[in-house]
């Protein structure tokens, strides 16, 4: 699910040239997806990334780089790696972002006009480029943080520390749940991170709490240590209702370099799920999460993971599945980014629908009727296969819910759906004191390192 994301997931649609756009038609036979794919040099030249005809291909697989002179002369600089975007000038040279070859699931990198990877081996992930009068500024996702670097000859120079934009200004008078950083190890020893957000006014000493695990989209996305509020069930929204939230960053996401991102290629939902489950086990073991009041929620790839999780275990009492894939072969055939989906999982063995008879968890399935990224048939298939599920389809909505009334309705349904977890509390529930055994039979013993966040 190749959506372009903010703190959760933003609407992704196949790029189309805007009608009358000033840069449309710069390169005959090709199209420019957006203004962000054109960079202007002070002397009037333009660096342009083009894609093939949007009517036959979204273009992510075969972009090309060009220089267009002021008189309209086009110089072709050759094909660029998949998903090329955001060209900027660096003196008389051009650099841009693209996927690290040769796979379609992996980390973004910075390339020069000769298509050489300038960030190979970097243990973080470039997410944006900004043209300046000198060296370009590279926005870098590094773990839970975001940093700004200057692109230099053979090295990056960091120009800021962690950058956290203030997204909560309109809510300064609203009490928020305490947010903490969580670091732990996967069963195979891989270092992982994530966030824990507690109910408003509570500390970990007040636990165990009902816990909702929020799985991010992508999978090439992440939870950053910033304000967690969105139009889907989100951590601060849940904190207002007495829930703790676990926001894991499993392998496959951004912020940890190319190898970390590429680890789920052809193995979607495998080690990725164990990364998530291990974090839940540790939160139960530390008395933060009530093992009898666990829920899971996600949108897009997170929706797939929520559906996949309840085929792996019966520990969840509620699962919110938003715009998620349930059948990978059908998604590859009917979705608009089939080649990218095939790089993640291409068989029924990766599909929740194959194991739907195992699902005992109640499901709330939500989808946009006009979603072309993940067609609504994915939701309909899962709903038809699971009797204890509710399906909500919003007419006219795409891969993101954009209409205010629909957002309110979605959150109201989610609120009532997850409220059932409060009713499951045992009168004498006590925190677990030993590591919990997950559905796979593993016992996880690595220590948890809790770090206080500056978010609130």
Regions found by a protein language model. Give the residues of each.
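The conserved beta1-alpha1 loop
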Residues: 215-217, 367
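A structured, mid-to-C-terminal "fold-capping" secondary-structure block
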Residues: 214-215, 272
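Short glycine-rich anion-binding loops that position phosphate/pyrophosphate groups of nucleotides
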Residues: 218-219, 371
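Conserved beta-strand elements of the Class I
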Residues: 211-213, 364
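Active-site-proximal cap/loop segments of hydrolase catalytic domains
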Residues: 247-454
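A fold-wide structural signal in alpha/beta-hydrolase
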Residues: 211, 239-249, 390
């Amino acid at each position: 699910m190749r959506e372009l994301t903010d703190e959760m997931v933003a609407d992704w649609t196949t790029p189309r040239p805007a009608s009358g756009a000033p840069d449309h038609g710069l390169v005959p036979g090709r199209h420019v997806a957006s203004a962000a794919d054109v960079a202007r040099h002070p002397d009037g030249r333009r660096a342009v990334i083009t894609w093939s005809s949007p009517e036959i291909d979204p273009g992510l697989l075969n972009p090309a780089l060009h220089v267009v002179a002021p008189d309209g002369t086009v110089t072709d600089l050759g094909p660029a790696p998949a998903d090329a975007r955001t060209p900027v000038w660096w003196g008389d040279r051009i650099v841009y972002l693209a996927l690290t070859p040769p796979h379609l699931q992996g980390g973004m990198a910075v390339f020069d006009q000769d298509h050489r990877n300038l960030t190979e081996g970097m243990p973080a992930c470039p997410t944006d480029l900004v043209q300046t009068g000198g060296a370009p500024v590279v926005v870098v996702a590094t773990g839970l943080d975001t940093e700004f670097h200057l692109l230099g000859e053979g090295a990056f120079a960091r120009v800021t520390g962690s950058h956290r934009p203030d997204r909560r200004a309109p809510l300064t008078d609203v009490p928020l749940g305490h947010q903490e950083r969580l670091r732990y190890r996967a069963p195979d020893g891989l270092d992982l991170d994530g966030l824990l957000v507690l109910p408003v006014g509570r500390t970990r000493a007040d636990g165990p709490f009902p816990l909702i695990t929020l799985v991010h989209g992508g999978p090439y996305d992440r939870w950053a240590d910033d304000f967690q509020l969105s139009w889907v069930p989100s951590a601060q929204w849940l904190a207002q209702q007495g829930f703790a939230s676990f926001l894991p960053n499993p392998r496959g996401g951004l912020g940890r370099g190319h190898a970390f991102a590429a680890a789920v290629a052809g193995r979607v939902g495998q080690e990725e799920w164990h990364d998530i489950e291990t974090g839940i086990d540790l939160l139960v073991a530390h008395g933060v999460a009530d093992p009898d009041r666990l829920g899971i929620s996600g949108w897009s790839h997170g929706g797939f993971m929520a559906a996949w999780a309840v085929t792996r275990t019966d520990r969840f009492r509620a699962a919110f599945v938003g715009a998620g894939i349930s059948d990978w072969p059908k998604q590859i055939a009917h979705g608009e980014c089939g080649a990218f989906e095939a790089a993640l999982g291409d068989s029924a063995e990766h599909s929740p629908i194959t194991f739907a008879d195992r699902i005992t968890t109640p499901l709330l399935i939500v989808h946009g009727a006009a979603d072309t990224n993940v067609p609504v048939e994915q939701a309909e298939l899962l709903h038809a296969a699971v009797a204890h599920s509710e399906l909500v389809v919003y007419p006219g909505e795409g891969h993101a819910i954009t209409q205010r009334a629909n957002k309110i309705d979605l959150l109201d349904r989610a609120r009532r759906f997850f409220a059932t977890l409060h009713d499951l509390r045992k009168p004498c529930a006590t925190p677990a004191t030993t590591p919990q055994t997950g559905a796979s039979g593993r016992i996880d013993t690595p220590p948890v390192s809790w770090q206080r966040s500056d978010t609130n």
